[in-house]
Swiss-Prot record:
Keyword Ubl conjugation included in the entry's annotation: yes
This protein's UniProt keywords: Coiled coil, Isopeptide bond, Nucleus, Phosphoprotein, Ubl conjugation
Name of the protein in question: Arginine/serine-rich protein PNISR
Modified residues (Phosphoserine): 204, 211, 290, 304, 313, 321, 465, 467, 726
Coiled coil: 237-276, 427-461
Basic and acidic residues bias: start-end ranges: 197-210, 238-258, 421-463, 473-486, 494-508, 659-721, 732-753
Residue segments, region Disordered: 75-331, 382-805
InterPro entries found in the cross-reference section: PNISR
């Protein structure tokens, strides 16, 4: 039992409880007529008597509000909210999926609020606490003034929830989606409620009777109907609310169907307009957006009207606010939206694509008439007949053909222009590449020309130097020949022949050595050439001085040979002459080496492009030819001697003996020469290997030391030039003295001897050999090259004389 103000809660009679329970169990809640049930319950309640009518408690205000209830409201709210059955009983959808809950057995009657409500602060133009409004969105909050269940059911209007005047609609207006008039009948009047102040009324009360659904206007039911409705049990009120919600859902479905039909009609009109129009069109505004805007405006109006006119049930609140939609309806709306969006996008894209395709087709069709057909002789002959003129205007066809030809001309010109640009770029690249190649080839040619010019200049210089040397040596030989008497000519021929043989051997050796060293690079040859040039300059200088000094000697010779004091001077200067001989022999040995190196360098330059194997073969072939020639000559001489032995023996016995000795000597020489050649060939091979290694080293060091060597060689050549000049003067003087001595001894021998001129000529080789042994080596080196030339002529004369003998 709950208490309120010390008054006990009246229990239902047993027959009422049994009747209600039997009624609930007999019928299905979905098929119950809740209005008839409520009328029956009210009639039974009135028949049971008005025992529950009690006077108001002393703490009532003039407007029917209980002060003690207002004070105890929050406490009761807190206590009641802690109950475990509270949340289960007061769910927002408690009447949708299950039967209304039965009253508890211990607490027989518990009238709930019409819906979860919340007190809203008063409006601006109301100063009293009685003008509270229900917020439409806060539906799940329980009213704090709805828990005072201390009074009887008939006086339940005295509670703080029923503090407003229902007739004037300050907080609860007449139900707009409410019950039909026959469901509620006027009952006995209850206690009159005090009138409400006008300042507590909202100013826009009469203007806010709006709703999106047009319903018949009903008269305001009396206050008794509202009070009776509040006194109904919870399960009957739940049934009534359920019935109202079902009606609202039906109305909403009808409205949605109308909207859908309107949308479909608008879509059809839009598609018809799009098909009728030509060309691309801009995307039209979506119709669904405008409908949503209209719905938003209606919902705002409904919310504003819902704040003013309220019913005790939550059904009218849902009508004024946005209607709650089921999941199926939401899915259906989403499908509609997606369809609309997709169709709009598809239409836009297809319109653009169709426009571009049509444009391309039109452009191609205008290009279709070719020039050949427009200008062909067949068409000209057909048009000349006159029968085709009536089928169409020729001017339009000509214009079309001209347009097509112009467009085709422009396209062809563009293509040609592009092709020309590409060809020009390609040609430019080719020209650049060719220019680069030509430049490279020219540079290579210039380098080769420079190298060849340098080589030619070098060879020319060497040839000039050799010619100068030969001229100087020829002058020396001529001077020496003039010094000698004509009687010494046959004695001189023999040593010249011997010099020839030696020179040939030396030439073959130098050829082989030069062939072995021909594989060396141009750097070594250039270095040797620089050395040779310096030596040539020094030798030329010495030859000039010698030629100058020889002229006064000629004048002094007869006086020296005739006068006896000259002999004393010679004997005195022998020691001095020996010293001079040693020095001159050294200098001449150096000159020989330099000449040999010069000759070898010249041969290397001539044989650069030749391989060493070819040079070796040629040198060997030359040596073989020389051997064969010598052997053939010796055989021919032997045959001649054998053919005429008797004629030669009579009167020329001494000559045969001399020739036999000479042949024996030649054979011995040839044998010794062969042995020497073999040894020298071996030594050359070794030297070649050594030279190759040296050349590799010298090539590395030559780059850095070539310049320094050139400077040093120039300085040495200048020094040697001065020294050789002084030495050559001394040597020439000494030679002239020796020649005078030899001439004197020869004259004495000739006068004393009684032999014939033939013996003297036959014995001349032996005497010449003895003289040759006495001669120093440096005197031979001077007359080697010129003796070859003059010796050839003398040998020919000697051979002719020997044959005639």
């Amino acid at each position: 039992m709950w208490d309120q103000g010390g008054q006990p809660w009246q229990q239902w009679p047993l027959n009422q409880q049994q009747w209600m329970q039997s009624f609930q169990h007999q019928q299905d809640p979905s098929q119950i007529d809740w209005a008839a049930l409520a009328q029956a319950w009210i009639a039974q309640r009135e028949a049971s008597g008005q025992q529950s009518i009690v006077e108001q408690p002393p703490g009532m205000m003039p407007n029917g509000q209980d002060m003690s209830a207002m004070e105890s409201g929050p406490n009761n709210h807190g206590n009641f909210q802690g109950d475990s059955n509270f949340n289960r009983m007061w769910q927002p959808e408690w009447g949708m999926h299950q039967q209304p809950p039965h009253p508890p057995p211990e607490q027989p009657w518990m009238p709930p609020a019409p819906g979860p409500m919340d007190i809203v602060p008063p409006s601006e133009d109301s100063n009293s606490q009685d003008s509270g409004e229900f917020a439409p969105d806060n539906r799940h909050i329980f009213n704090q003034n709805n828990h005072n269940f201390g009074g009887p059911p008939d006086n339940f209007a005295v509670g703080p929830v029923n503090q407003f005047d229902y007739q004037h609609g300050a907080a609860f207006g007449p139900p707009q989606g409410g019950f039909h008039p026959p469901y509620w009948q006027p009952g006995p009047p209850g206690p009159p409620a005090p009138t409400q102040n006008r300042r507590e009324r909202p100013p826009s009360f009469r203007d806010r009777q709006r709703s999106p659904i047009a319903l018949p206007v009903k008269q305001e039911p009396p206050q008794i109907d509202a009070v009776k409705r509040r006194t109904l049990p919870a399960w009957i009120r739940e049934g009534l609310e359920k019935m109202e919600r079902e009606k609202q859902k039906k109305l909403e479905k009808e409205r949605m169907e109308q909207q859908r039909s309107q949308l479909s009609k608008k879509e059809k009109k839009a598609t018809e307009d799009a098909e009728g129009g030509d060309g691309p069109r801009l995307p039209q505004r979506s119709k669904f957006d405008s409908d949503e805007e209209d719905e938003d405006a209606e919902n705002l109006e409904a919310v504003s009207s819902g704040k003013v006119t309220r019913s005790p049930s939550p059904a009218p609140q849902e009508e004024h606010s946005e209607p709650e939609m089921t999941e199926e309806e939401k899915e259906y709306q989403m499908m509609l939206l997606t369809k609309m969006l997709l169709t709009e996008i598809l239409l836009d894209v297809t319109d653009e694509e169709i426009y571009y395709v049509a444009k391309d087709a039109h452009r191609k069709a205008t290009k279709a008439p070719a020039k050949q057909l427009a200008q062909s002789s067949a068409l000209a002959s057909l048009t000349g007949l006159g029968g085709l003129g009536g089928y169409g205007s020729g001017d339009s066809e000509d214009e079309r053909s001209d347009r097509g030809s112009e467009s085709s001309d422009t396209d062809d010109e563009e293509l040609r222009h592009r092709i020309r640009q590409k060809q020009e770029a390609f040609w430019r690249k080719e020209k650049e590449q060719q220019l680069l190649q030509d430049k490279q080839i020219e540079e290579e040619k210039q380098q080769t020309e420079r190298v060849t010019k340098e080589m030619n200049e070098f060879i020319h210089r060497e040839q000039n130097s050799l010619s100068l040397l030969e001229a100087s040596e020829a002058d020396r030989d001529a001077v020496n020949d003039k010094k000698r008497t004509p009687n010494e000519a046959p004695s001189v021929l023999e040593p010249k022949r011997e010099h020839k043989g030696k020179e040939k051997e030396r030439g073959s050796r130098s050829g082989s050595s030069s062939s072995g060293s021909s594989s060396s690079g141009s750097r070594t040859s250039s270095s040797s050439s620089s050395v040779s040039s310096s030596s040539y300059s020094s030798s030329s200088g010495s030859s000039c001085t010698s030629s100058r000094s020889s002229s006064p000697k000629r004048r002094k010779r007869p006086s020296r040979s005739r006068s006896p004091p000259a002999k004393a001077r010679r004997s005195r200067s022998r020691s001095y002459s020996r010293r001079v001989k040693v020095d001159s022999s050294r200098t001449r040995g150096k000159l020989r080496d330099r000449r040999r190196s010069n000759r070898s360098s010249i041969e290397r330059e001539r044989r650069r492009n030749r391989s060493p194997s070819r040079d070796r073969r040629r040198s060997r072939s030359r040596s073989r030819d020389r051997r064969t020639n010598r052997s053939s000559r010796s055989r021919s001489r032997d045959r001649r001697k054998i053919e005429d032995p008797r004629g030669n023996l009579s009167g020329n016995s001494h000559k045969h003996k001399g020739e036999a000795k000479e042949q024996d000597r030649k054979k011995e020489r040839s044998r010794s020469v062969d042995k020497d050649r073999r040894k020298k060939d071996k030594e050359r091979d070794r030297e070649l290997d050594k030279r190759k290694e040296k050349q590799k080293r010298e090539e590395k060091d030559f780059k850095f030391s070539s310049q320094d060597d050139r400077l040093k060689r120039k300085r040495e050549s200048e020094r040697t030039f001065c020294r050789s000049g002084s030495i050559s003067v001394k040597v020439i003087r000494h030679d002239s003295r020796q020649d005078s001595k030899k001439n004197a001894t020869k004259d004495s021998k000739r006068h004393s001897g009684s032999d014939s001129s033939g013996r003297s000529s036959s014995e001349s080789p032996g005497s010449s050999k003895e003289k040759k042994a006495k001669k120093p080596k440096h005197s031979r080196s001077r007359s080697l090259e010129k003796s070859q030339r003059s010796g050839k002529k003398a040998s020919r004369k000697h051979k002719s004389k020997s044959r005639s003998r």
